[in-house]
From Swiss-Prot:
It comes from the Viruses. One of its GO terms (cellular component) is membrane. The chain crosses the membrane at residues 23-43. Its main location: host cell. This is Uncharacterized protein ORF13. It is a single-pass membrane protein. It comes from Spiroplasma virus SpV1-C74 (SpV1). It is found in: Host membrane. Keywords: Host membrane, Membrane, Transmembrane, Transmembrane helix.
Amino acid sequence: MSLYDYWVQFVSYIIGANAPEFLYVISFVLFIVLFFGMFFKLIQKMWSF
């Protein structure tokens, strides 16, 4: 199973199985953006030392 499949199961567990497809895509993209944003901030903090 891919990460997206897990994400669809996770979102449908919280919201319910009747969530539209675009909601999964938008929330997945937001999750990836937030994850990489925090990841890059962590790298910048490590490089500043």
